[in-house]
Amino acid sequence: MPKELKDLKDYLNVLKRPDAKSVVVYKKKSKGGLLSTKFKVRCSRYLYTFSVPNQVKAAKVEATIPSNLEKKVISNKKN
């Protein structure tokens, strides 16, 4: 079952856990032209999701991902 994280501190604590395996970053452009970013952290029991609507804040959050975790970036490009 996925769990949604609302707070940045909770997300950072999940990243530091020893059972965190990988992070998938989804970058999706909406119809209004805004870019929303979702971070999905795979742990042993749950998949934790943290979404950021602000592009500048999302870049800062993406920089906090530890190097020992596998990181995969998926961007949705629509013409």
UniProtKB/Swiss-Prot annotation:
GO biological process: protein-RNA complex assembly; translation
InterPro entries assigned to the protein according to its UniProt record, in alphabetical order: Ribosomal_eL38, Ribosomal_eL38_sf
Kinase found in the keyword field: no
The encoding gene: RPL38
Protein name: Large ribosomal subunit protein eL38
Disulphide bond pairs: none
Family: Belongs to the eukaryotic ribosomal protein eL38 family.
GO molecular function: structural constituent of ribosome
Organism listed in the record: Theileria annulata
Keyword Ribosomal protein: yes
Origin: domain of life: Eukaryota
Keyword line: Ribonucleoprotein, Ribosomal protein
UniProt-listed Pfam families: Ribosomal_L38e
GO CC aspect terms: cytosolic large ribosomal subunit
